[in-house]
């Protein structure tokens, strides 16, 4: 998979969650903040990242840097995706189904952030299993990265697009 250069894209960021985490030491608890951020150009590129620091802004900055390193390309067909797919990660599953134009993004929480920043405007989704934000985002990104256009599938099978689609 080729790496996508984030400097050539106009990326938009969205903070999904900020979590306070604690390390218990002899003198009490040491608190830090973990941030989960999604970045995308609303035109077929999306990525997510996590960052941890003692202050919230630092955690968000680290998460944005991480997200820019993990960009993927999403094949879009019009305003939706080419076909149905289930993305898996851990105990989390996200079902993604293309929808007719004008349907909108029907998705909950973290999944919505990923789909909107990827540039998908019409889609149906259902999250199954784990509802932890990081697992849902990873399952969604996993599903989106496995999508293939009809042309790619036809080329793999050595057939024409017309033969493939009937």
From Swiss-Prot:
A GO biological process of this protein is:
translation
Q: Where is the signal peptide?
A: none
A GO molecular-function annotation: rRNA binding
Keyword Ribosomal protein set for record: yes
PROSITE patterns named in the record: RIBOSOMAL_S5, S5_DSRBD
**A UniProt-annotated Pfam family:** Ribosomal_S5_C
List each copy of the S5 DRBM domain by range.
Answer: 11-74
> Does the keyword field hold Transferase?
no
Q: Name one GO cellular component term.
A: small ribosomal subunit
Keyword set, alphabetical order: Ribonucleoprotein, Ribosomal protein, RNA-binding, rRNA-binding
Q: Please report which protein family the annotation says this sequence is part of.
A: Belongs to the universal ribosomal protein uS5 family.
What is this protein for, i.e. what is its function?
With S4 and S12 plays an important role in translational accuracy. Located at the back of the 30S subunit body where it stabilizes the conformation of the head with respect to the body.
Instruction: Name the PANTHER family on file.
Output: MITOCHONDRIAL RIBOSOMAL PROTEIN S5 (PTHR48277:SF1)
Oligomeric form and interacting partners: Part of the 30S ribosomal subunit. Contacts proteins S4 and S8.
Q: Which NCBIfam families match?
A: rpsE_bact (TIGR01021)
The UniProt comment on domains reads: The N-terminal domain interacts with the head of the 30S subunit; the C-terminal domain interacts with the body and contacts protein S4. The interaction surface between S4 and S5 is involved in control of translational fidelity.
Name-wise, this protein is Small ribosomal subunit protein uS5
Gene for this protein?
A: rpsE
């Amino acid at each position: 998979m080729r790496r996508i250069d984030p400097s050539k894209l106009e990326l938009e960021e969205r903070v999904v969650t900020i979590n306070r985490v604690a390390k218990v030491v002899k003198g009490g608890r040491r608190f830090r903040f973990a941030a989960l951020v999604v970045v995308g150009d609303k035109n077929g590129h999306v990525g997510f990242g996590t960052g941890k620091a003692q202050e919230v802004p630092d955690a968000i900055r680290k998460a944005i840097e991480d997200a820019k390193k993990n960009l993927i390309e999403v094949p879009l067909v019009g305003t939706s995706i080419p076909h149905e797919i289930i993305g898996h990660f851990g105990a989390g599953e996200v079902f993604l189904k293309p929808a007719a134009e004008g349907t909108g993004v029907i998705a909950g929480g973290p999944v919505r952030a990923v789909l909107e920043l990827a540039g998908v405007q019409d889609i149906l989704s259902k999250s199954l299993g784990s509802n932890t934000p990081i697992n849902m985002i990873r399952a969604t990104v996993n599903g989106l990265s496995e999508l293939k256009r009809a042309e790619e599938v036809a080329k793999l099978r050595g057939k024409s697009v017309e033969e493939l689609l009937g």
